[in-house]
Amino acid sequence: MKSDSITAYGDKDIQVNKIYAEGNFGDSILKIGRYGEFSSYGRIIDTEISGAEYTFEAGDLSGALTYGRLKDSRTLAGTTFENPKDTKETFGAYLGTEYSSARLKYNLSPVTAIGATYGRLNEVTVAEKGNNFQDSVNFWEAGFNTKLADNLTLMAAYSKSDLDGVTDSVGSEVVNDGWFSELRYKQHNPSDVGSFAIFTNYRNVGAFSTIDATVDYTENVRGWTLGFDYVPMENTTIEVFYTTGTQVNATSTEGRQDVDIF
């Protein structure tokens, strides 16, 4: 049985640790419990689920199969939209509880890899301006990462779902695809005191292209970020960043808002 200090939230906002059991079977691992689920590049999902995951390695190819349950009280990308007919009301696509996925990653060379993930959410409830309906939603993700030089890496990934026909607060269709790219100098490691990383990323991430992506501030945002990670003591990371951009879809009847975070 394993657990770690990263926490998630269960029913009624009770804080719980990730906790799971795992067993090795040759070059494969079976994990059962509550654990962090991560698509190939974290564009579809990077959050905790309760279920089972089977991972394997075969030379330069690795992959995983997952089935689990998510907390269903939140929306895709954590995004809700004001109802133009009544701004006191909001609507969005609320998560189904069942999630399944298959992902693959292949090392093209010692410095370059490609990856892809297929994911499926059952019974997503779309509450659009008082008209509710349920549907299963499929997600796809593909990307690559490469080492350009010593201590300099580049990654880029694209994700898309088949949830369409939903409009935002100003009547535009909610975007169901998105892409994310990042250039990073060095890598910080929480166990390596003094390690650091400098990064910049640019993205255009539609709200319906992700369940819960790595770096929440990238969801439903078109723009760029400049940041810095530093490890002052073991298991402690300080991150400072500035991000700027605009919403991909308007969550307010006043239109798309600018996004500036420091």
Regions found by a protein language model. Give the residues of each.
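Short, low-complexity, polar/charged sequence segments that are solvent-exposed and flexible
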Residues: 49-53, 82-85, 217-221
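Alpha-helix capping and helix-loop boundary segments enriched in small/acidic/polar residues
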Residues: 8-9, 42, 89-92, 131-132
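Intrinsically disordered, low-complexity Ser/Thr- and acidic-rich flexible linkers and loops
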Residues: 77-91
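Outer-membrane beta-barrel pore domains
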Residues: 8-11, 111, 118, 122, ...
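Surface-exposed intrinsically disordered loops and tails
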Residues: 3-7, 87, 168
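A short, terminal or domain-edge coil/loop segment
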Residues: 45-57, 87, 103, 247-261
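Outer membrane beta-barrel
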Residues: 1-79, 96-116, 175, 179-212
